[in-house]
UniProtKB/Swiss-Prot annotation:
Bias kind Basic residues: ranges: 30-39
Organism: Human herpesvirus 1 (strain MP) (HHV-1)
Region (Disordered): 1-161
A GO CC annotation given for this chain: host cell cytoplasm
Keywords carried by this UniProt record: DNA-binding, Host cytoplasm, Host nucleus, Host-virus interaction, Inhibition of host autophagy by virus, Inhibition of host innate immune response by virus, Inhibition of host interferon signaling pathway by virus, Inhibition of host MDA5 by virus, Inhibition of host PKR by virus, Inhibition of host RIG-I by virus, Inhibition of host RLR pathway by virus, Interferon antiviral system evasion, Late protein, Phosphoprotein, Repeat, RNA-binding, Viral immunoevasion
Predominant place of localization: host cell
Domain of life: Viruses
Compositionally biased tracts (Basic and acidic residues): 90-161
Placement of Sequence repeats on the sequence: 85-90, 91-96, 97-102, 103-108, 109-114, 115-120, 121-126, 127-132, 133-138, 139-144, 145-150, 151-156
Modification comment: May be phosphorylated on Ser residues by host kinases.
Entry protein name: RNA-binding protein
12 X 6 AA approximate tandem repeats as annotated region, ranges: 85-156
Notes concerning its domains: The N-terminal tetrapeptide may be responsible for virion incorporation.
Length: 161
């Protein structure tokens, strides 16, 4: 019986951590590329800009630096304005010819109006004459007392029989 080696402790960058294959650059935990004793030993996928001096400071991940001065060309379909499909016009019935209208009289410019002449000031409105008291209404005939409805069984809760 052959002796088996005891399993080695699993550490960052060990191929045993991953399911199969050699760990690619994207599979390393985040602290792997940091120099030994680097304060940033964080596990997780590598972030562009973690150890990239060109990425700038203050959380600039460096992703926007790819081609800041180059313009991304759009496909030609995106530039063309969309064409609205036109429905073919349905020919209308031919118009019935009308007899020609009699010519209108040419419009004559109106004579300029004089400024408005103020009306004669009226006396302030006279107070109304007091109303004559109305004649008292004829008294209505007394109402008949309302008759109670036909007697029914007292209502019970729904479904109760």
């Amino acid at each position: 019986m052959s002796q088996t080696q005891p399993p080695a402790p699993v550490g960052p960058g060990d191929p045993d951590v991953y399911l199969k294959g050699v760990p690619s650059a994207g599979m390393h935990p985040r602290g792997v590329h940091a120099p030994r004793g680097h304060p940033r030993m964080i596990s997780g996928p590598p972030q562009r800009g973690d150890n990239d001096q060109a990425a700038g400071q203050c959380g600039d991940s460096g992703l926007l630096r790819v081609g800041a001065d180059t313009t991304i060309s759009k496909p030609s379909e995106a530039v063309r304005p969309p064409t609205i499909p036109r429905t073919p016009r349905v020919p209308r019935e031919p118009r019935v010819p009308r007899p020609p209208r009699e010519p209108r009289e040419p419009r004559v410019p109106r004579a300029s109006r004089d400024p408005r002449v103020p009306r004669d000031p009226r006396d302030p409105r006279q107070p109304r004459s007091p109303r004559e008291p109305r004649s008292p209404r004829e008294p209505r005939p007394p109402r008949e007392p309302r008759t109670p409805r036909t007697t029914r069984e007292p209502r019970t809760a729904r479904g109760a029989v």
